[in-house]
Amino acid sequence: MAQDYHHGVRVVEVNEGTRSITTVSTAIVGMVCTGDDADAKMFPLNKPVLITDVLTASGKAGESGTLARSLDAISDQAKPVTVVVRVPQGETEEETTTNIIGAVTAEGKKTGMKALLSAQTQLGVKPRILGVPGHDNKAVATELLSMAQSLRGFAYLSAYGCKTVQEAITYRENFSQREGMLIWPDFAGWDTVLNAEATAYATARALGLRAKIDEQTGWHKSLSNVGVNGVTGISADVFWDLQDPATDAGLLNQNDVTTLIRKDGFRFWGSRCLSDDPLFAFENYTRTAQVLMDTMAEAHMWAVDKPLNPSLARDIIEGIRAKMRSLVSQGYLIGGDCWLDESVNDKDTLKAGKLTIDYDYTPVPPLENLMLRQRITDQYLVNFASQVSA
């Protein structure tokens, strides 16, 4: 110590022990919209804007473009924290696509959907539920999936321009990323600007519903089979039967396309994402992996540059184990564990200031295929006479 001799009492504070781990926030929507007549102060172009009341914000979103309709669609489902980037509507679809995809200017300013990457620095939140309602053509969808990977978020995409089941299935072949879900067709709903029923973007409703499920149930529950608010119909005919797999809905789901059904209201039907890896076939498998990665990483900033003693490694391991037990008890995981692998933590590695901690987990699978086995039997007639006399 700085002074070895001291005639008196000194207290040295020792901060050891496990730290509690807080799960990262997941119910944060991020979307890119058009709306040339929106309030320019409320929604400046190419700048991420934090909205805590989507319904009130929709009043300043104008009437043109997709901004007001998307905010209204989200507010029908929930009132999540939302990050919006407004871009100018181009004179052509190609120009609008360029505006939405965005770029980085010579001054380093990010435009279009790339501005979502600045949200955490500028606004203090990271959008994780991503969409571009009404403008998510193949070029936009491809870029949005890249954004989803960068943000560890999840993108909800429409089968843009598809008119039939077969077209939607063919369109799905354009993607392989686990960070996205493809939806076909759209909903229908009442448009207060047109004073008529019109197409209601399914992706906008998916953003709001995903946030609602995260808040009320959890990120381990998929989007499928939850009632959707604020819609009056479906934009295309989709044949669905709960007990028959040979349907339009069954064929779409089999090919990783989430569809829409009407049963006790309107619902998304399908839990699969666009992953080419069977380990992450379901939407909630991907989101579970993302949540755990960010939760575990961000919860251990405190440990960086601490003296690498055995007690530090033990505290990290016990903290992760405690978090796993908590997630299991709440139903977010089936199981999970954490340990130190001696084979990768040899003396040379440790001497270099490197520590490797392993953990595993089992996500909660959605019940996609329920088989009920029905049997006919006469065994309940054996005691017929005795039951009569009784």
Model-derived regions: residue spans:
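Surface-exposed assembly/interface segments
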Residues: 1-390
